[in-house]
Swiss-Prot record:
Summary of the function given for this chain in its UniProt record: Functions as part of axonemal radial spoke complexes that play an important part in the motility of sperm and cilia. Functions as a protein kinase A-anchoring protein that scaffolds the cAMP-dependent protein kinase holoenzyme. May serve as a point of convergence for MAPK and PKA signaling in cilia.
Phosphothreonine carried by residues: 143
Main location: cytoplasm
Coiled coil region boundaries: 206-242
Name this protein carries in UniProt: Radial spoke head protein 3 homolog B
Gene Ontology biological process terms from the UniProt entry: epithelial cilium movement involved in extracellular fluid movement; flagellated sperm motility; mating
Record localization: Cytoplasm, Cytoskeleton, Cilium axoneme; Cytoplasm, Cytoskeleton, Flagellum axoneme
Organism: Mus musculus
Keyword Membrane carried by entry: no
Gene: Rsph3b
Length: 389
């Protein structure tokens, strides 16, 4: 409230102001305001299936909160949506921003400087070398002695001799007390040192006894370990002896049984194997496998050569006989006056060797076409009969 009295204002020389008192409005609404004044805003609806306050699953299980250190998935989704909206808004602003039209065909846009002062743009930046020398490190000055500030006042008092007490009279009891306390403290320290020495000696004796007992315990443990190892070794050795004895007995019994079983079986088996050809004489087998096949091949080759020679000879004989037969038939068909000229003429050749030589080549050509020598002997025999006639 403003002070309206000018005299008071002039007397004080200050400007004062005080506000009018008013009641403070209640910030909290009453629960019946909504009933008295219904809200006209539309009610917002939500799906409780996506409400995080609704517990799903087993109702007996304790609700587990968010694991510390892991981000909230809803918060992450909200941040991603906000980031997406910001990117979309930025793209829309870039599209709405006025741009330079596209250059004409054959030209291109070039960036130029539009500032007031031109600046040279080079590939290499201008570099300038500068040096600066710092001072050497100075020794740290000594720390000044800390003197606390005075908190009281200095007052001086003068005491004359004999005003407080008589030195000879009052110092003697004090001195006796000090000397007595000093002697008593000295005695206590000496007794403490003796007690510590006794404790140290007793501790040393106990340590000696403990070391002896530990050595004895180690000896007994080592002895027990050796006894246990010896026992295990003896048991293992005895088990090996028993195992070997049982194995030997089994082998001996198996050997005796095998000998008894094979006593009558071996001769028959050996006889069958010998008859089957499993046991053979190496020399005889070498002759049968190596020598006899070679011998048979050589014999077959020799017989083949001899049969080829016989076949060639039979064919030669047959050709000669056929030629003779043809000559005699021709002679019988001729008149009687010409028989002598034909047979004994100057151009007549009666030597069979010449005929053989002339007909040898065609006969050799026909050897390969003849199937067998037995078939060639038949016409030869027929020719022989004709010659005999």
């Amino acid at each position: 409230m403003t002070d309206r009295n000018p005299r008071t204002a002039e007397a004080s020389g200050l400007y004062t102001y005080s506000s009018r008192p008013r009641a403070v409005a209640c910030q909290r609404r009453r629960h019946r305001d909504s009933i008295l004044q219904p809200v006209e805003e539309p009610m917002s609806y939500g799906n409780i299936m996506y409400d995080r306050r609704v517990i799903r699953g087993n109702t007996y299980a304790l609700p587990t909160g968010q694991v510390p250190g892991q981000p909230d998935p809803l918060e992450l989704q909200r941040q991603q949506q906000a980031r997406r909206r910001a990117l979309a808004r930025k793209r829309a602003q870039e599209q709405l921003k006025p741009r330079t039209p596209e250059p004409v065909e054959g030209r291109k846009h070039v960036d130029i400087q539009t500032e007031l002062y031109l600046e040279e743009i080079a590939d290499r930046i201008v570099e300038v070398d500068m040096e600066c020398q710092t001072d050497a490190f100075l020794d740290r000055p000594p720390t000044p002695l800390f003197i606390p500030a005075k908190t009281g006042k200095d007052v001086a008092t003068q005491i004359l001799g004999g005003e407080l007490f008589d030195f000879d009279l009052e110092v003697k009891p004090m001195l006796e007390v000090l000397v007595g306390k000093t002697i008593e403290q000295s005695l206590l320290e000496v007794m403490e040192e003796e007690e510590l020495a006794n404790l140290r000696a007793r501790q040393y004796a106990y340590e000696e006894i403990r070391n002896v007992e530990l050595a004895e315990v180690q000896r007994l443990e080592e002895q027990e370990r050796r006894h246990r190892e010896e026992k295990e070794r003896r048991k293992k050795q005895q088990w090996e002896i028993v195992h070997k004895r049982n194995e030997t007995l089994q082998k001996i019994s198996a050997l005796i049984f095998a000998r008894q079983y094979l006593a009558n079986l071996l001769p028959s088996v050996f006889d069958k194997l010998r008859n089957s050809g499993f046991f053979y004489d190496p020399i005889e087998r070498d002759i049968e496998v190596g020598f006899l096949p070679w011998l048979m091949n050589e014999v077959e080759k020799s017989m083949e050569h001899s049969m080829v020679g016989r076949t060639v000879l039979d064919m030669l004989i047959r050709d000669v006989v056929e030629r003779r037969i043809n000559d005699y038939e021709h002679k019988e068909a001729m008149p009687p006056g010409q028989k002598t000229n034909v047979i004994n003429g100057p151009n007549t050749v009666t030597d069979p060797s010449v005929t053989t030589l002339h007909t040898q080549k065609p006969v050799l050509d026909r050897v390969s076409s003849q199937p067998a020598p037995s078939q060639e002997r038949k016409p030869v025999e027929e020719g022989g009969h004709l010659m005999a006639e």
